[in-house]
Regions:
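Histidine-centered active-site loop/cap adjacent to the catalytic His
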Residues: 27, 382-424
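N-terminal Lys/Arg-rich, disordered targeting/topogenic segments
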Residues: 1-20
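Conserved SGNH/GDSL esterase-like catalytic core that processes O-acyl groups on lipids
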Residues: 84-91, 95-98, 103, 107-108, ...
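Hydrophobic membrane-insertion alpha-helices, especially the h-region
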Residues: 26-41
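Serine-dependent acyl-ester chemistry module
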Residues: 17-19, 184-354, 358-361, 366-374, ...
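Generic structural signal for small/hydrophobic residues in well-ordered secondary structure
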Residues: 40, 118, 162, 178, ...
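Short, amphipathic alpha-helical "lid/cap" segments that border enzyme active or binding sites
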Residues: 159, 163, 292, 296, ...
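Membrane/wall-proximal cationic-aromatic binding patches
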Residues: 50-139, 143, 266-272, 348-352, ...
């Protein structure tokens, strides 16, 4: 009797516990399903609000054809970049710079720097106040050194166009110091006559010298513009899964492919690198080496021209995202199925080091500073865009500011050895092949 009673009690307890576990399991399942449903809805809302578009679409709204440079920013123009990671309005001043209004003549007792570069310097991924030039200017002024850092950057430019911009426009501002920001994709376009279909200037080599080969640059036929913002294509399947996959692809490619092997999604598809990326190839490829030869000649000419004006030239090396982030390098290797040793991540930087050493151009390498600044969930680069975010611009400005102090590349009133401004403001007239005041 006692045994039977005990068995009935144990059975009742087990039944209660079983029901409790079933209730708990049901709550877990319902919570998980609710989480997935809410996550899916949120993912679809986020994707629907993402802005698509191409760089050229916005750029066409504030640039114009230029017979020397191929294109330049229009005066007093504006356009808004709408991207998944940023929405930024770009405005130009009365001189066609993405900058505050600047007089051609430097203000009294003011140190003037001119920054030459491409989209990293123009900085269309961040507000004007957050660009590398404005952050550097703020640091100088906050330190007690009255300064102006002029933003001479234009998206899509390579070193040849930056050189020509200095000769035709930049020298007018009498900068004491000229900072040339150099990025890996500048190299190959030095030996090309168009940039993604848009004609650009071309130089020809002769006796290690460069000569402008084509003036005026051909004008690209105008395309019909659309005022509507381009939207991303609708997601097929789960939007939440697509968002997770996309972020793992770029941020944790090993995890992405591990889950792909389990059948959750397809592995990273194989692609072929564009010619411009072969500057990292371990082999010395002829088209790349020809472009490097032209880069050396253009840098030599720019240095001579800057010094003829009584200014100093320094080169600022911008590392590619994959040079700074291990995850980006892994994703690149998987995308192109690169074998070990096929590419050398240090090759571009090493080439730049040799060039600047040979030409006696001071080098500011941003690689160490940007690597040191990288933190989990606090990157210096945008995840999808590949340019700097506001933090990246600020870290770059900080590194340049530190170099200015340690190298004494400041005017005497700020503890350095440079003049406040250039001796000459003469510019180049390509139509006459002469200089004019």
């Amino acid at each position: 009797m006692r045994v039977a009673t005990r068995l009935r009690k144990n059975a009742a307890v087990m039944s209660v516990r079983r029901r409790e576990w079933l209730v708990r399991l049901s709550l877990i399942v319902v919570s998980l399903l609710l989480f997935l449903v809410v996550g899916e809805i949120a993912a679809r809302i986020l994707i629907s609000r993402q802005n698509g578009g191409k760089e050229g679409k916005e750029q066409a709204r504030y640039t114009e054809y230029d017979p020397l440079l191929g294109w330049r920013k229009r005066k007093m123009a504006s356009a808004t970049y709408k991207r998944r990671e940023y929405t930024v309005e770009v405005k130009t001043n009365s001189q066609g710079l993405r900058d505050p209004e600047r007089s051609l003549e430097p203000p009294p007792q003011t140190f003037r720097i001119l920054a030459l570069g491409d989209s990293f310097v123009e900085g269309y991924t961040v507000d004007l106040k957050d660009t590398v030039t404005k952050r550097l200017e703020s640091r100088l002024n906050d330190s007690g050194c009255a300064a102006e850092v002029i933003n001479g950057g234009t998206a899509g430019y390579s070193t040849d166009q930056e050189y020509l911009f200095y000769r035709s426009d930049g020298a007018r501002y009498r900068p004491s110091l000229v900072l040339l920001f150099f990025f890996w994709n500048d190299v190959i376009y030095l030996d090309r006559q168009d940039y993604f279909g848009t004609p650009k200037p071309a130089f020809e080599m002769g006796d290690a010298q460069v000569k402008l080969h084509r003036y005026p640059v051909k004008e690209k036929p105008k395309e019909a513009s659309s005022s509507e913002d381009e939207k991303p294509e609708p997601v097929e399947g789960s939007a939440l899964l697509a968002m997770i996959r996309e972020r793992l692809w770029l941020g944790a490619p090993d995890v992405h492919d591990a889950l792909a092997r389990l059948g959750l999604w397809n592995p990273i598809p194989k692609s072929s690198p564009r010619l411009e990326m072969l500057v990292y190839d371990q082999r010395d490829l002829a088209p790349v080496e020809d472009a490097w030869e032209k880069a050396e000649a253009i840098l030599k000419s720019l240095k001579q021209d800057v010094e003829d004006h009584g200014s100093t030239l320094a080169l600022v090396y911008i590392p590619g995202k994959m040079e700074v982030q291990e995850a980006s390098w892994k994703a690149t290797r998987q995308l192109y199925r690169l074998k070990d040793g096929a590419w050398n991540l240090d090759k571009v930087r090493q080439k730049v080091e040799r060039l600047t050493s040979t030409l006696h151009i001071p080098l500011i390498d941003l690689n160490p500073a940007l690597k040191a600044a990288e933190q989990p969930f606090r990157s210096t680069y945008l995840m999808f865009d590949g340019h700097w975010n506001a933090r990246g611009h600020d870290e770059a400005a900080s590194a340049v500011f530190d170099w200015l102090k340690t190298s004494k590349s400041l005017p005497e009133v700020c503890g350095g050895t440079l003049p406040l401004q250039a001796r000459s403001a003469q510019v180049f007239d390509p139509a006459l092949q002469t200089r004019e005041p």
